[in-house]
């Protein structure tokens, strides 16, 4: 595995920008600001695949990356409630889908994702992925 300083993925770049633009002194306010920005970064990363094992590996990679960046920034692992919040976001943002039909593979059930609005508490609108692609979100009918 590549060390954090050598990674170039989109989420890695977002974490790097967050680290560069938030105070590093370990105060409660600074940690809260960093965490809010980090959760927004995770909320902005979406992906799907037909294969369930690829979905699992992608989810794991995002969650582990969050934990690694958190530990590097604050010198300790995130607490379980924080990990659970990230896991909830990741479970919605990385999903299994037939990309040609916008459905769960081998079914007629359309895939629903979250359009995140807040990080604390987690608040989001459910939208059909197909409608997002076709620009039919709740705010843009």
Where are these regions (language model features)?
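SAM-dependent methyltransferase catalytic region
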Residues: 1-141
